[in-house]
Amino acid sequence: MSVSAFNRRWAAVILEALTRHGVRHICIAPGSRSTPLTLAAAENSAFIHHTHFDERGLGHLALGLAKVSKQPVAVIVTSGTAVANLYPALIEAGLTGEKLILLTADRPPELIDCGANQAIRQPGMFASHPTHSISLPRPTQDIPARWLVSTIDHALGTLHAGGVHINCPFAEPLYGEMDDTGISWQQRLGDWWQDDKPWLREAPHRESEKQRDWFFWRQKRGVVVAGRMSAEEGKKVALWAQTLGWPLIGDVLSQTGQPLPCADLWLGNAKATSELQQAQIVVQLGSSLTGKRLLQWQASCEPEEYWIVDDIEGRLDPAHHRGRRLIANIADWLELHPAEKRQPWCVEIPRLAEQAMQAVIARRDAFGEAQLAHRISDYLPEQGQLFVGNSLVVRLIDALSQLPAGYPVYSNRGASGIDGLLSTAAGVQRASGKPTLAIVGDLSALYDLNALALLRQVSAPLVLIVVNNNGGQIFSLLPTPKSERERFYLMPQNVHFEHAAAMFELKYHSPQNWQELETTLVDAWRTPTTTVIEMVVNDTDGAQTLQQLLAQVSHL
């Protein structure tokens, strides 16, 4: 019997089972212990293969692929700390609803806890973050193939969001020619090999439930809060709120068109919050709210009912309102809860939103990051998409811009880390094939710098704007101690990205004014390659501009 041959047949069953659950994209890092999985994936024509040498970036690449495809994405890594590098992407997927399947190769049990190389305790290492964890046994013909495939099917058939961890120990030898070992073991699955359905089908019942008193509540004074959702859902939510006559407070990730723009500015005005106090019901569609003033209002508002509608399970209200947590697809829920045409009940807020936007426009000429955030809608590629980084940049865009309704926007706003942002953007572009504008800060770019290797492989123009404000300037918005702020919070690195782009053979520009930036963008959208645009700005201007606008709008 050939151990290496049976390892591969065992792995082939695992990989084939994944295809029955919609897995098409598979991300592979180099490694020896994962050889059976890698070769099985390489031989399966159902997969689109992606490779990367950094497992942390690989996990985020998979995250980006899953965001766009809405399908589970598989990841293959070798044993040891390679597995631990998948933790950040797994955590993010659990919070934002993407489906990841982590296939982690492992040493066999006799090599654990005995000083063997690259052998750590992998089963259960992700604690409660996966929705399902499987610790497979060492491949053996004593275990029927139907057990293996039904075990995989059970985990994936009930996967609605988040990650599945499948730990796969393999004994040596890992290499060798294929022989007849294990053929009869595989063949006991019969015509499953020619089918395209799971061996075991488990479909959890998830049907939106109609709120029987909706006809009553839709006649009341309501507010719609729109969080993270799809582009198509964003357009439907905007129309729904408009029909009801309810004010819509749209997050940067809502894709609603933000009909009341600059919400994170005007929510700091007492006239706005006073008018919102008249609301009898708040319906929040989607989670992961960005704006600080929005979160403050959300925490302090006290309507008679607060409903949160999101496809993700669990508690999504840090303010713990009395109300309803409705687990449903947003589009399906809207269909079950039609709007009734009513006149808008808010008078003050539309005026404040218009005045706030005019205040922003009055400052748009200076060459800075706040102004870039406001102008970003002018720079979006046609039929494209936007990927927004975390920290200060996403808050500026949320507060100062008005993105088009239905224009796809992606971000990692679950755990809101700055790790893996370039890798996630690469996955977003690959899965969609669309022109992509990505915008991140300098520390975020440094954190994921080797992901520039992934950006060499794009199928449409990708522009990466790195806003270089020399450190974590978001801490300028917080009451951090001035004497320790620069060293312990901002951590300026005094670097530029020209040589990094050159190392990965990417086009690079550092415009000094808006005309140069716009000329660079026109050229960049013409070719299916990556262009790195470094926008060097004054360290504190972005944060100061936001603070000045907040003060100005609060006194309107």
UniProtKB/Swiss-Prot annotation:
Cysteines paired by S-S bonds: none
Subunit structure: Homodimer.
GO BP term (any one): menaquinone biosynthetic process
A Pfam family: TPP_enzyme_C
Cofactor note: Binds 1 thiamine pyrophosphate per subunit.
Pathways per UniProt: Quinol/quinone metabolism; 1,4-dihydroxy-2-naphthoate biosynthesis; 1,4-dihydroxy-2-naphthoate from chorismate: step 2/7; Quinol/quinone metabolism; menaquinone biosynthesis
Enzyme class: transferase
Protein's recorded name: 2-succinyl-5-enolpyruvyl-6-hydroxy-3-cyclohexene-1-carboxylate synthase
Cofactor: Mg(2+); Mn(2+); thiamine diphosphate
SUPFAM superfamilies recorded: Thiamin diphosphate-binding fold (THDP-binding)
Annotated catalysed reactions: isochorismate + 2-oxoglutarate + H(+) = 5-enolpyruvoyl-6-hydroxy-2-succinyl-cyclohex-3-ene-1-carboxylate + CO2
Family statement drawn from the similarity comment of this UniProt entry: Belongs to the TPP enzyme family. MenD subfamily.
Gene this chain is encoded by: menD
Entry function: Catalyzes the thiamine diphosphate-dependent decarboxylation of 2-oxoglutarate and the subsequent addition of the resulting succinic semialdehyde-thiamine pyrophosphate anion to isochorismate to yield 2-succinyl-5-enolpyruvyl-6-hydroxy-3-cyclohexene-1-carboxylate (SEPHCHC).
HAMAP family given in the database record: MenD
Keywords carried by this UniProt record: Magnesium, Manganese, Menaquinone biosynthesis, Metal-binding, Thiamine pyrophosphate, Transferase
EC number: 2.2.1.9
Coiled-coil ranges from the UniProt annotation: none
Organism: Escherichia coli O127:H6 (strain E2348/69 / EPEC)
InterPro entries: MenaQ_synth_MenD (IPR004433), MenD_middle (IPR032264), THDP-binding (IPR029061), Thiamin_PyroP_enz_TPP-bd_dom (IPR012001), TPP_enzyme_TPP-bd (IPR011766)
